[in-house]
Amino acid sequence: MASNSSSGHDVRPPSLTPSEIDKILSMTLIANLATLGEDDTIHIVPMWFMRFGNDIFIPTSRLTRKYKNLKARPYASVMIDISREGLDLKGALIRGPVELVEGEEARKINHQIHLKYVTEEGLNDPSIALYLSKGDDVTVRIHMGHIVNWNLADSKAGRALRIKDRSRQLDA
C-alpha cells in the first residue's frame, strides 16, 4: 500500500481522521477479534463490541477458545471495518494488552453491549436472554495501545471504482 507508482506519484490512500476513527468505533459493526493459541496459531472470531473511552469491550464466555488464549496470553488485535464493493473500505486495527473482566462488572458491561445489538423485545425473549446471560459471563477489555487505520474509499482508485458498473457487488 505504501509504495510509489513508477510516475513518482504517491499511491498511499488517505488516513482516517481521529473523528472518523471515533465514528467507526461507535457504529454497530462486527469486530474481528484475533488471539494467539498455545501452538502459535491465530484464532479469529467475529464479535459484538462497544467502545468506552480508550478501551474496546467484547462479551464472551469462559468456555471459549478466545478466553483460554487471552488468559494465557493477554494481548489481542481487533479489526473493526466498513467493507463494501470495490475499494470502498475503511477501518481500524487495534492492538493492545487485554484485561479479562468477570463477575457483576462483566454482567453490567455485557448488558450494555447486548443493548447495542439487540432490542429490548429481543432481550426479553427467553431463548435469547438465556443464551446471552449464560454464554456471556466474561468481558474482554482491550486497551487501545496501537491503532492502524485505512481509508481506501477516499483514495483516487476508490473514488474511481464507485462510478457505476466499475466494481462488482459483494455477496450478502
Segments (PLM) and residue ranges:
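Aromatic-glycine hotspot motif
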Residues: V11-P14, P18-L29
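A short beta-turn/loop motif at secondary-structure boundaries
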Residues: D39-T41, R84-L87, L130-K134
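Alpha-helix boundary recognition
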Residues: L25-S26, K71-A72, S133
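Charged, gly/pro-rich active-site loop segments
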Residues: A2-L16, K90-A172
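Helix-adjacent hinge/juxtasegments
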Residues: P59, T64-E99
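Short beta-strand segments
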Residues: T28-R62, L70, S77-D81
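Short histidine-centered beta-strand/loop micro-motifs
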Residues: I58-S61, K68-N69, K108-I109, L130-L132
